[in-house]
Swiss-Prot record:
Its EC number is 1.1.1.86. GO terms for cellular component: cytosol. PROSITE patterns: KARI_C, KARI_N. One of its GO terms (molecular function) is magnesium ion binding. The keyword S-adenosyl-L-methionine does not apply. It holds the Pfam family KARI_C. It comes from Pseudoalteromonas translucida (strain TAC 125). This is Ketol-acid reductoisomerase (NADP(+)).
Amino acid sequence: MANYFNTLPLREQLAQLAQCEFMNADEFTDGVDALKGKKLVIVGCGAQGLNQGLNLRDSGLDVSYTLRDSAISERRQSFLNASENGFTVGTYQELIPTADVVLNLTPDKQHTSVVNAIMPLMKQGSTLAYSHGFNIVEEGMQVRDDITVIMVAPKCPGSEVREEYKRGFGVPTLIAVHPENDPQGHGLAQAKAYAAGTGGHRAGVLKSSFIAEVKSDLMGEQTILCGMLQTGSILCFDKMIEKGIDAGYASKLIQYGWEVITEALKYGGVTNMLDRLSNPAKVKAFELSEELKQIMRPLYNKHQDDIIDGTFSRTMMEDWNNDDANLLKWRAETAETHFEKTPAGNVEIAEQEFFDNGILMVAMVKAGVELAFETMTAAGIIAESAYYESLHETPLIANTIARKKLFEMNRTISDTAEYGCYLYNHACLPLLQDFMQKIDTDVIGKGLGEHSNQVDNQTLIQINTALREHPVEKVGATLRGYMSAMKKIV
Protein backbone atom coordinates (compact mmCIF):
# COMPACT_ATOMS: atom_id res chain seq x y z
CA MET A 1 0.00 0.00 0.00
CA ALA A 2 1.19 3.51 -0.81
CA ASN A 3 0.90 6.57 1.43
CA TYR A 4 -2.45 8.02 0.29
CA PHE A 5 -1.47 11.64 0.90
CA ASN A 6 1.64 11.29 -1.25
CA THR A 7 -0.38 9.94 -4.19
CA LEU A 8 -2.44 13.13 -4.44
CA PRO A 9 -1.61 16.16 -6.61
CA LEU A 10 -0.31 19.16 -4.66
CA ARG A 11 -3.53 21.16 -5.03
CA GLU A 12 -5.58 18.28 -3.65
CA GLN A 13 -3.13 17.83 -0.77
CA LEU A 14 -3.46 21.50 0.14
CA ALA A 15 -7.25 21.44 -0.21
CA GLN A 16 -7.61 18.47 2.13
CA LEU A 17 -5.12 19.87 4.65
CA ALA A 18 -7.20 23.05 4.78
CA GLN A 19 -10.53 21.29 5.16
CA CYS A 20 -11.96 22.31 8.52
CA GLU A 21 -15.34 23.87 9.23
CA PHE A 22 -17.02 24.40 12.58
CA MET A 23 -20.53 22.96 12.44
CA ASN A 24 -23.51 24.80 13.90
CA ALA A 25 -25.65 23.16 16.56
CA ASP A 26 -28.69 23.23 14.26
CA GLU A 27 -26.89 20.79 11.94
CA PHE A 28 -27.39 18.11 14.60
CA THR A 29 -31.14 18.42 15.12
CA ASP A 30 -31.60 14.90 13.71
CA GLY A 31 -29.42 13.49 16.49
CA VAL A 32 -28.63 9.82 15.91
CA ASP A 33 -31.47 9.22 13.43
CA ALA A 34 -29.14 8.26 10.56
CA LEU A 35 -27.96 5.28 12.62
CA LYS A 36 -31.26 4.33 14.28
CA GLY A 37 -32.26 0.76 13.55
CA LYS A 38 -28.79 -0.09 12.27
CA LYS A 39 -26.48 -2.64 13.81
CA LEU A 40 -23.20 -1.11 15.02
CA VAL A 41 -20.34 -3.52 15.65
CA ILE A 42 -17.19 -2.21 17.33
CA VAL A 43 -13.87 -3.94 16.69
CA GLY A 44 -11.75 -3.67 19.83
CA CYS A 45 -12.70 -2.75 23.37
CA GLY A 46 -9.94 -0.61 24.82
CA ALA A 47 -10.40 2.89 26.22
CA GLN A 48 -11.94 4.48 23.12
CA GLY A 49 -13.81 1.34 22.10
CA LEU A 50 -15.50 0.76 25.44
CA ASN A 51 -16.35 4.36 26.25
CA GLN A 52 -17.62 5.25 22.81
CA GLY A 53 -19.72 2.09 22.85
CA LEU A 54 -21.27 2.95 26.21
CA ASN A 55 -22.20 6.41 24.95
CA LEU A 56 -23.63 5.12 21.68
CA ARG A 57 -25.74 2.54 23.53
CA ASP A 58 -27.00 5.14 25.99
CA SER A 59 -27.96 7.26 22.97
CA GLY A 60 -30.32 4.50 21.86
CA LEU A 61 -28.18 2.70 19.30
CA ASP A 62 -27.67 -1.05 18.82
CA VAL A 63 -24.05 -1.75 19.77
CA SER A 64 -22.10 -4.99 20.04
CA TYR A 65 -18.41 -5.93 20.03
CA THR A 66 -16.34 -8.23 17.89
CA LEU A 67 -12.94 -9.45 19.04
CA ARG A 68 -10.30 -11.87 17.84
CA ASP A 69 -11.00 -15.50 18.70
CA SER A 70 -8.05 -15.58 21.11
CA ALA A 71 -9.27 -12.50 23.02
CA ILE A 72 -12.59 -14.25 23.64
CA SER A 73 -11.26 -17.73 24.45
CA GLU A 74 -8.58 -16.35 26.77
CA ARG A 75 -11.03 -13.88 28.34
CA ARG A 76 -8.64 -10.97 27.86
CA GLN A 77 -9.33 -7.49 29.21
CA SER A 78 -11.06 -6.38 26.01
CA PHE A 79 -13.51 -9.29 26.36
CA LEU A 80 -14.11 -8.48 30.02
CA ASN A 81 -14.61 -4.78 29.24
CA ALA A 82 -17.40 -5.59 26.80
CA SER A 83 -19.06 -8.57 28.47
CA GLU A 84 -19.10 -7.14 31.99
CA ASN A 85 -20.88 -4.06 30.65
CA GLY A 86 -23.64 -6.20 29.17
CA PHE A 87 -22.68 -6.06 25.51
CA THR A 88 -23.00 -8.92 23.05
CA VAL A 89 -19.51 -10.16 22.13
CA GLY A 90 -18.71 -12.36 19.16
CA THR A 91 -16.04 -13.33 16.68
CA TYR A 92 -15.49 -11.55 13.38
CA GLN A 93 -17.28 -14.36 11.54
CA GLU A 94 -20.27 -14.16 13.88
CA LEU A 95 -20.89 -10.41 13.94
CA ILE A 96 -19.24 -8.60 11.02
CA PRO A 97 -21.62 -10.01 8.35
CA THR A 98 -24.59 -8.64 10.33
CA ALA A 99 -23.16 -5.13 10.79
CA ASP A 100 -24.47 -2.05 9.04
CA VAL A 101 -21.61 -0.01 10.53
CA VAL A 102 -18.27 -1.44 11.66
CA LEU A 103 -16.30 0.83 14.01
CA ASN A 104 -12.58 0.02 13.90
CA LEU A 105 -11.35 1.20 17.30
CA THR A 106 -8.25 -0.97 17.55
CA PRO A 107 -4.69 0.47 17.92
CA ASP A 108 -3.15 2.00 14.79
CA LYS A 109 -0.63 -0.78 14.26
CA GLN A 110 -3.45 -3.36 14.09
CA HIS A 111 -5.57 -1.49 11.54
CA THR A 112 -4.22 -3.08 8.37
CA SER A 113 -4.55 -6.65 9.63
CA VAL A 114 -7.97 -5.93 11.15
CA VAL A 115 -9.40 -4.27 8.04
CA ASN A 116 -8.01 -6.98 5.78
CA ALA A 117 -9.66 -9.58 8.03
CA ILE A 118 -13.07 -7.92 8.30
CA MET A 119 -13.51 -6.42 4.82
CA PRO A 120 -14.36 -9.74 3.10
CA LEU A 121 -17.00 -10.31 5.79
CA MET A 122 -18.65 -6.87 5.54
CA LYS A 123 -21.98 -6.80 3.76
CA GLN A 124 -22.64 -4.85 0.59
CA GLY A 125 -23.19 -1.13 1.18
CA SER A 126 -22.09 -1.11 4.81
CA THR A 127 -19.95 1.53 6.54
CA LEU A 128 -16.46 1.35 8.02
CA ALA A 129 -15.71 3.96 10.71
CA TYR A 130 -12.43 5.06 12.27
CA SER A 131 -11.50 7.40 15.12
CA HIS A 132 -8.07 8.15 13.63
CA GLY A 133 -7.21 8.27 9.95
CA PHE A 134 -3.67 6.85 10.05
CA ASN A 135 -4.60 3.62 8.27
CA ILE A 136 -6.24 5.47 5.39
CA VAL A 137 -3.78 8.34 5.04
CA GLU A 138 -0.37 6.95 5.99
CA GLU A 139 -0.79 3.27 5.15
CA GLY A 140 -3.01 3.89 2.14
CA MET A 141 -5.62 1.27 2.97
CA GLN A 142 -7.91 0.76 -0.02
CA VAL A 143 -11.44 -0.09 1.05
CA ARG A 144 -13.97 -1.88 -1.14
CA ASP A 145 -15.81 0.50 -3.46
CA ASP A 146 -19.27 -0.24 -2.07
CA ILE A 147 -18.26 0.56 1.53
CA THR A 148 -18.67 4.05 3.01
CA VAL A 149 -15.66 5.18 5.06
CA ILE A 150 -16.09 7.80 7.79
CA MET A 151 -14.17 9.12 10.76
CA VAL A 152 -15.34 10.42 14.13
CA ALA A 153 -12.38 11.50 16.26
CA PRO A 154 -13.02 12.71 19.82
CA LYS A 155 -10.27 15.10 20.87
CA CYS A 156 -9.45 13.51 24.23
CA PRO A 157 -8.73 10.16 25.89
CA GLY A 158 -11.54 7.61 25.96
CA SER A 159 -12.20 8.02 29.68
CA GLU A 160 -13.06 11.69 29.17
CA VAL A 161 -15.42 10.80 26.31
CA ARG A 162 -17.48 8.84 28.82
CA GLU A 163 -17.22 11.19 31.78
CA GLU A 164 -18.31 14.24 29.80
CA TYR A 165 -21.21 12.29 28.29
CA LYS A 166 -22.40 11.24 31.75
CA ARG A 167 -22.42 14.91 32.72
CA GLY A 168 -24.77 15.59 29.82
CA PHE A 169 -22.01 17.23 27.81
CA GLY A 170 -19.37 15.87 25.42
CA VAL A 171 -15.91 16.47 24.01
CA PRO A 172 -14.90 18.39 20.87
CA THR A 173 -14.86 16.04 17.89
CA LEU A 174 -13.58 15.98 14.32
CA ILE A 175 -15.62 14.18 11.66
CA ALA A 176 -14.74 13.34 8.07
CA VAL A 177 -15.80 11.28 5.07
CA HIS A 178 -13.13 9.61 2.93
CA PRO A 179 -13.57 11.16 -0.54
CA GLU A 180 -12.71 7.83 -2.20
CA ASN A 181 -15.47 5.96 -0.33
CA ASP A 182 -18.88 7.62 -0.17
CA PRO A 183 -20.78 5.61 -2.80
CA GLN A 184 -24.26 6.33 -1.45
CA GLY A 185 -23.62 9.91 -0.37
CA HIS A 186 -24.71 9.30 3.22
CA GLY A 187 -21.29 9.36 4.86
CA LEU A 188 -21.68 12.83 6.36
CA ALA A 189 -25.12 12.06 7.80
CA GLN A 190 -23.78 8.91 9.44
CA ALA A 191 -20.69 10.69 10.78
CA LYS A 192 -22.88 13.41 12.30
CA ALA A 193 -25.12 10.79 13.92
CA TYR A 194 -22.08 8.94 15.28
CA ALA A 195 -20.72 12.19 16.76
CA ALA A 196 -24.12 12.94 18.29
CA GLY A 197 -24.21 9.44 19.76
CA THR A 198 -20.96 10.05 21.62
CA GLY A 199 -22.12 13.50 22.80
CA GLY A 200 -19.58 15.37 20.70
CA HIS A 201 -22.18 17.67 19.15
CA ARG A 202 -22.70 19.32 22.54
CA ALA A 203 -19.05 20.44 22.72
CA GLY A 204 -18.43 21.37 19.10
CA VAL A 205 -17.81 19.40 15.92
CA LEU A 206 -15.35 20.24 13.16
CA LYS A 207 -16.08 18.88 9.69
CA SER A 208 -12.59 18.01 8.55
CA SER A 209 -10.78 15.52 6.32
CA PHE A 210 -8.89 12.33 7.05
CA ILE A 211 -5.71 14.08 5.95
CA ALA A 212 -6.15 17.20 8.09
CA GLU A 213 -6.96 15.08 11.14
CA VAL A 214 -3.93 12.82 10.75
CA LYS A 215 -1.34 15.47 9.94
CA SER A 216 -2.47 17.77 12.77
CA ASP A 217 -2.98 14.97 15.30
CA LEU A 218 0.51 13.58 14.75
CA MET A 219 2.06 17.03 15.04
CA GLY A 220 0.29 17.94 18.26
CA GLU A 221 0.98 14.70 20.09
CA GLN A 222 4.66 14.59 19.12
CA THR A 223 5.44 18.15 20.18
CA ILE A 224 3.48 20.07 22.82
CA LEU A 225 1.10 17.36 24.00
CA CYS A 226 3.56 14.62 24.87
CA GLY A 227 7.08 15.40 23.70
CA MET A 228 7.30 18.84 25.31
CA LEU A 229 5.73 17.70 28.58
CA GLN A 230 8.13 14.75 28.82
CA THR A 231 11.16 16.88 27.93
CA GLY A 232 10.09 19.64 30.31
CA SER A 233 9.54 17.16 33.15
CA ILE A 234 13.03 15.71 32.84
CA LEU A 235 14.82 19.04 32.38
CA CYS A 236 13.01 20.90 35.16
CA PHE A 237 13.40 18.07 37.65
CA ASP A 238 17.09 17.56 36.92
CA LYS A 239 17.76 21.29 37.25
CA MET A 240 16.11 21.44 40.67
CA ILE A 241 18.14 18.47 41.88
CA GLU A 242 21.31 20.08 40.56
CA LYS A 243 20.49 23.22 42.56
CA GLY A 244 19.88 21.33 45.80
CA ILE A 245 16.10 21.41 45.98
CA ASP A 246 14.53 18.50 47.87
CA ALA A 247 13.86 15.64 45.45
CA GLY A 248 10.39 14.91 46.83
CA TYR A 249 9.35 18.54 46.45
CA ALA A 250 10.81 18.74 42.94
CA SER A 251 9.02 15.55 41.92
CA LYS A 252 5.68 16.78 43.23
CA LEU A 253 6.07 20.24 41.68
CA ILE A 254 6.56 18.66 38.25
CA GLN A 255 4.13 15.75 38.50
CA TYR A 256 1.18 17.88 39.60
CA GLY A 257 2.35 21.23 38.30
CA TRP A 258 1.59 20.57 34.63
CA GLU A 259 -2.01 19.76 35.54
CA VAL A 260 -2.53 22.87 37.69
CA ILE A 261 -0.82 25.20 35.23
CA THR A 262 -2.68 23.91 32.18
CA GLU A 263 -6.01 24.07 33.99
CA ALA A 264 -5.65 27.83 33.61
CA LEU A 265 -4.80 27.27 29.95
CA LYS A 266 -7.96 25.21 29.48
CA TYR A 267 -10.29 27.98 30.64
CA GLY A 268 -8.62 31.10 29.31
CA GLY A 269 -5.81 30.14 26.98
CA VAL A 270 -2.19 31.21 27.19
CA THR A 271 -3.30 34.66 28.35
CA ASN A 272 -5.05 33.35 31.44
CA MET A 273 -2.18 31.00 32.22
CA LEU A 274 0.30 33.88 32.32
CA ASP A 275 -2.18 36.10 34.15
CA ARG A 276 -1.85 33.68 37.08
CA LEU A 277 1.73 34.93 37.53
CA SER A 278 2.83 38.12 39.23
CA ASN A 279 3.82 40.86 36.81
CA PRO A 280 7.58 40.28 37.25
CA ALA A 281 7.07 36.53 36.81
CA LYS A 282 4.92 37.11 33.74
CA VAL A 283 7.67 39.17 32.12
CA LYS A 284 10.22 36.48 32.94
CA ALA A 285 8.02 33.66 31.61
CA PHE A 286 7.34 35.58 28.42
CA GLU A 287 11.03 36.24 27.84
CA LEU A 288 11.93 32.61 28.48
CA SER A 289 9.20 31.38 26.16
CA GLU A 290 10.36 33.63 23.34
CA GLU A 291 13.90 32.28 23.72
CA LEU A 292 12.59 28.72 23.77
CA LYS A 293 10.57 29.33 20.62
CA GLN A 294 13.63 30.58 18.80
CA ILE A 295 15.66 27.53 19.83
CA MET A 296 12.96 24.93 19.17
CA ARG A 297 11.35 26.28 15.98
CA PRO A 298 13.63 24.27 13.65
CA LEU A 299 12.75 21.09 15.57
CA TYR A 300 9.02 21.79 15.26
CA ASN A 301 9.47 22.44 11.55
CA LYS A 302 11.32 19.14 11.15
CA HIS A 303 8.57 17.21 12.92
CA GLN A 304 5.91 18.81 10.74
CA ASP A 305 7.94 18.23 7.55
CA ASP A 306 8.51 14.57 8.44
CA ILE A 307 4.80 14.16 9.16
CA ILE A 308 3.71 15.84 5.93
CA ASP A 309 6.00 13.88 3.62
CA GLY A 310 5.49 10.54 5.39
CA THR A 311 9.01 10.15 6.79
CA PHE A 312 7.72 9.79 10.35
CA SER A 313 5.13 7.14 9.48
CA ARG A 314 7.59 5.16 7.38
CA THR A 315 10.16 5.16 10.19
CA MET A 316 7.61 4.14 12.81
CA MET A 317 6.17 1.36 10.67
CA GLU A 318 9.68 -0.02 10.19
CA ASP A 319 9.82 -0.28 13.99
CA TRP A 320 6.44 -2.03 14.00
CA ASN A 321 7.95 -4.62 11.67
CA ASN A 322 10.91 -4.96 14.05
CA ASP A 323 8.67 -5.91 17.00
CA ASP A 324 8.69 -2.32 18.34
CA ALA A 325 12.36 -2.62 19.25
CA ASN A 326 12.96 1.13 19.46
CA LEU A 327 9.63 1.89 21.12
CA LEU A 328 10.19 -0.66 23.86
CA LYS A 329 13.80 0.42 24.39
CA TRP A 330 12.80 4.08 24.70
CA ARG A 331 9.92 3.20 27.03
CA ALA A 332 12.33 1.34 29.31
CA GLU A 333 14.80 4.24 29.25
CA THR A 334 12.05 6.68 30.26
CA ALA A 335 11.20 4.47 33.24
CA GLU A 336 14.80 4.82 34.44
CA THR A 337 14.91 8.64 34.45
CA HIS A 338 15.52 10.28 37.82
CA PHE A 339 12.16 12.07 37.70
CA GLU A 340 10.25 8.90 36.98
CA LYS A 341 11.93 6.98 39.83
CA THR A 342 11.57 9.70 42.47
CA PRO A 343 8.25 9.61 44.35
CA ALA A 344 6.40 12.83 45.03
CA GLY A 345 7.11 14.10 48.53
CA ASN A 346 4.55 14.33 51.29
CA VAL A 347 4.54 18.11 51.16
CA GLU A 348 1.67 20.52 50.67
CA ILE A 349 1.93 22.72 47.58
CA ALA A 350 -0.75 25.40 47.28
CA GLU A 351 -2.26 26.03 43.86
CA GLN A 352 -0.58 29.41 43.39
CA GLU A 353 2.78 27.97 44.42
CA PHE A 354 2.78 25.77 41.33
CA PHE A 355 2.72 28.96 39.24
CA ASP A 356 5.09 31.00 41.41
CA ASN A 357 7.73 28.25 41.58
CA GLY A 358 7.09 26.88 38.09
CA ILE A 359 7.74 29.92 35.91
CA LEU A 360 9.86 27.86 33.52
CA MET A 361 7.08 25.28 33.20
CA VAL A 362 4.65 28.05 32.24
CA ALA A 363 7.16 29.31 29.67
CA MET A 364 7.56 25.82 28.22
CA VAL A 365 3.81 25.34 27.85
CA LYS A 366 3.42 28.74 26.18
CA ALA A 367 6.32 28.10 23.80
CA GLY A 368 5.12 24.60 22.93
CA VAL A 369 1.49 25.56 22.34
CA GLU A 370 2.34 28.57 20.20
CA LEU A 371 5.03 26.78 18.20
CA ALA A 372 2.81 23.78 17.47
CA PHE A 373 -0.05 26.05 16.41
CA GLU A 374 2.19 28.27 14.27
CA THR A 375 3.89 25.31 12.60
CA MET A 376 0.62 23.59 11.76
CA THR A 377 -1.03 26.67 10.31
CA ALA A 378 2.11 27.46 8.29
CA ALA A 379 1.77 23.98 6.76
CA GLY A 380 -1.79 24.74 5.63
CA ILE A 381 -3.76 23.27 8.54
CA ILE A 382 -6.71 25.46 9.50
CA ALA A 383 -6.52 27.35 12.81
CA GLU A 384 -9.46 25.55 14.44
CA SER A 385 -7.90 22.15 13.83
CA ALA A 386 -4.48 23.37 14.99
CA TYR A 387 -6.04 24.73 18.20
CA TYR A 388 -7.64 21.40 19.13
CA GLU A 389 -4.40 19.54 18.46
CA SER A 390 -2.26 21.93 20.51
CA LEU A 391 -3.78 24.04 23.27
CA HIS A 392 -7.03 22.16 23.84
CA GLU A 393 -5.54 18.73 24.49
CA THR A 394 -2.60 19.86 26.63
CA PRO A 395 -4.56 19.85 29.96
CA LEU A 396 -5.91 16.39 29.18
CA ILE A 397 -2.42 14.96 28.72
CA ALA A 398 -1.10 16.86 31.76
CA ASN A 399 -3.80 15.14 33.79
CA THR A 400 -2.32 11.73 32.95
CA ILE A 401 1.11 12.81 34.26
CA ALA A 402 -0.53 13.82 37.54
CA ARG A 403 -1.88 10.30 37.93
CA LYS A 404 1.29 8.24 37.46
CA LYS A 405 3.93 10.45 35.88
CA LEU A 406 5.29 9.81 32.39
CA PHE A 407 4.43 6.11 32.62
CA GLU A 408 0.74 6.94 32.77
CA MET A 409 0.97 9.48 29.95
CA ASN A 410 2.71 7.02 27.65
CA ARG A 411 0.36 4.20 28.67
CA THR A 412 -2.73 6.29 27.96
CA ILE A 413 -1.73 7.73 24.60
CA SER A 414 -1.47 5.58 21.48
CA ASP A 415 1.72 3.77 20.51
CA THR A 416 1.88 6.17 17.57
CA ALA A 417 1.87 9.17 19.89
CA GLU A 418 4.35 7.51 22.24
CA TYR A 419 6.81 6.80 19.42
CA GLY A 420 6.65 10.42 18.23
CA CYS A 421 7.01 11.67 21.80
CA TYR A 422 10.29 9.82 22.21
CA LEU A 423 11.62 11.12 18.88
CA TYR A 424 10.93 14.67 20.02
CA ASN A 425 12.34 14.10 23.49
CA HIS A 426 15.60 12.65 22.17
CA ALA A 427 16.11 15.65 19.89
CA CYS A 428 14.95 18.35 22.31
CA LEU A 429 16.95 17.37 25.40
CA PRO A 430 20.36 18.14 23.83
CA LEU A 431 18.90 21.10 21.94
CA LEU A 432 18.03 22.82 25.23
CA GLN A 433 21.26 21.94 27.04
CA ASP A 434 22.85 25.39 26.71
CA PHE A 435 19.56 27.11 27.55
CA MET A 436 19.23 25.08 30.75
CA GLN A 437 22.77 26.00 31.84
CA LYS A 438 21.50 29.54 32.46
CA ILE A 439 18.42 28.45 34.42
CA ASP A 440 18.31 28.87 38.20
CA THR A 441 15.82 28.28 41.00
CA ASP A 442 14.22 31.71 40.56
CA VAL A 443 12.27 30.27 37.60
CA ILE A 444 12.00 26.63 38.68
CA GLY A 445 11.80 25.53 42.29
CA LYS A 446 11.81 28.66 44.46
CA GLY A 447 10.30 31.57 42.57
CA LEU A 448 11.38 35.17 42.19
CA GLY A 449 10.72 36.17 45.79
CA GLU A 450 10.72 39.84 46.72
CA HIS A 451 14.13 40.77 45.36
CA SER A 452 12.77 41.32 41.86
CA ASN A 453 9.42 43.09 41.90
CA GLN A 454 9.86 46.02 39.53
CA VAL A 455 8.24 46.01 36.11
CA ASP A 456 8.44 48.55 33.33
CA ASN A 457 4.90 49.60 32.40
CA GLN A 458 5.59 49.78 28.69
CA THR A 459 7.14 46.32 28.68
CA LEU A 460 4.15 44.87 30.51
CA ILE A 461 1.72 46.49 28.08
CA GLN A 462 3.62 45.11 25.11
CA ILE A 463 3.66 41.62 26.60
CA ASN A 464 -0.05 41.67 27.42
CA THR A 465 -0.83 42.83 23.90
CA ALA A 466 1.37 40.15 22.34
CA LEU A 467 -0.33 37.45 24.41
CA ARG A 468 -3.85 38.50 23.52
CA GLU A 469 -3.14 39.08 19.84
CA HIS A 470 -1.59 35.68 19.13
CA PRO A 471 -3.77 33.75 16.63
CA VAL A 472 -4.14 30.76 18.97
CA GLU A 473 -5.77 33.07 21.51
CA LYS A 474 -8.20 34.52 19.00
CA VAL A 475 -9.47 31.21 17.65
CA GLY A 476 -9.35 29.72 21.15
CA ALA A 477 -11.67 32.36 22.57
CA THR A 478 -14.28 31.42 19.96
CA LEU A 479 -13.95 27.66 20.37
CA ARG A 480 -13.92 27.79 24.17
CA GLY A 481 -17.23 29.60 23.95
CA TYR A 482 -18.74 26.32 22.77
CA MET A 483 -17.25 24.49 25.76
CA SER A 484 -18.52 26.70 28.57
CA ALA A 485 -19.82 23.67 30.47
CA MET A 486 -16.37 22.08 30.82
CA LYS A 487 -15.70 20.48 34.17
CA LYS A 488 -12.70 21.43 36.29
CA ILE A 489 -9.86 18.90 36.18
CA VAL A 490 -8.44 20.05 39.52
